């Protein structure tokens, strides 16, 4: 790979390169991030990396060569944890949890960075968790697939923008939103072939829900509890989204949305 293929750093700092097959470069993304300054970016060349990335109280710029070319996996905990990350961008990486304990592939607490063109898969919990009252992350154009619970779970007062994602073949819901104060923007996501419903809104949660496609899920296109607050209101959701071709129907309101999984 020549220098022309290394992405430009718009911040004007250095680009630290990760390449496990070339001893001139960093062997793991976490090692490069330890040395990265505020204006630096980390670029990950194609490969499979066993690593655990934890970033807190700073911005981050972590760029992979593409989610089909770069995989970061972890056996002991989720491969990506962001805590109070106040800016930056993560893109072009597949995050995969291969352990047996209860962890997610991508964990975002009270952060405001952009995560795009990534993939989150095989979490024992939800693939992606976005949580905390200061969470304003932008999660867009990602694939979230084959996780043991839901694809994307927004809770504990988070208000992220969740758009243009493909959430498929997750064991519970494509996207789930819970708790008072939680108010994501769910826009133009595709929730397909999930084993329960496409989108779940419950326990006093709010959400903007427009232009989403929920199809071929095992239950409903959209499921909500009476205490939830969708925008638009419930009887307008079918017009604002594509909720057809789900066996039980477009949407329903239920006091016990988790009864099918014994909760």
Tell me what each language-model feature is.
Residues 40-44, 62-64, 243:
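Extracellular beta-strand repeat scaffolds in secreted/surface proteins
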Residues 2-19:
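Short aromatic-glycine-(Arg/Gly/Cys) micro-motifs in beta-strand/loop hairpins
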Residues 14-50:
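Acidic Gly/Asp/Thr-rich repetitive segments characteristic of extracellular carbohydrate-active
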Residues 94-161, 166:
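Right-handed parallel beta-helix
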Residues 61-64, 88-92, 113-117, 136-140, ...:
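All-beta strand scaffolds that present successive hydrophobic residues in beta-strands
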Residues 20-27, 59-104:
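Right-handed parallel beta-helix/beta-spiral solenoid domain characteristic of secreted/periplasmic
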Residues 49-55, 67, 73-79, 99-105, ...:
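Short glycine/acidic-rich loop motifs that flank beta-strands on beta-rich extracellular proteins
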């Amino acid at each position: 790979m020549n220098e022309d293929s290394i992405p430009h750093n718009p911040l004007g700092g250095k680009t630290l390169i990760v390449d496990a097959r070339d001893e001139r470069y960093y062997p793991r993304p976490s090692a490069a991030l330890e040395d990265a300054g505020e204006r630096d970016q980390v670029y990950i060349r194609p490969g499979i990396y066993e690593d655990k990335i934890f970033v807190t109280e700073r911005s981050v710029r972590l760029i992979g060569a593409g989610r089909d070319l770069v995989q970061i996996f972890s056996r002991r905990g989720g491969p990506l944890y962001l805590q109070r990350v106040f800016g930056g961008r993560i893109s072009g990486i597949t995050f995969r949890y291969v352990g047996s304990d209860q962890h997610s592939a991508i964990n975002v607490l009270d952060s405001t960075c952009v995560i795009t063109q990534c993939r989150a898969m095989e979490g024992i919990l939800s693939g992606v968790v976005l949580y905390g009252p200061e969470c304003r992350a932008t999660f867009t154009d990602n694939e979230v697939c084959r996780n043991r619970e839901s694809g994307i779970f927004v809770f504990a007062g988070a208000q992220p923008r969740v758009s243009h994602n493909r959430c498929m073949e997750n064991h519970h819901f494509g996207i789930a939103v819970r708790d008072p104060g939680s108010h994501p923007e769910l826009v133009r996501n595709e929730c397909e072939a999930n084993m329960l419903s496409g989108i779940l809104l419950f326990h006093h949660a709010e959400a903007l829900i427009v232009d989403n496609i929920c199809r071929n899920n095992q239950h409903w296109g959209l499921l909500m509890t009476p205490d939830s607050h969708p925008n638009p209101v419930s009887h307008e959701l079918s017009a604002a989204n594509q909720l057809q071709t789900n066996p039980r129907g477009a949407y329903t309101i239920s006091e016990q949305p988790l009864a099918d999984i014994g909760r």
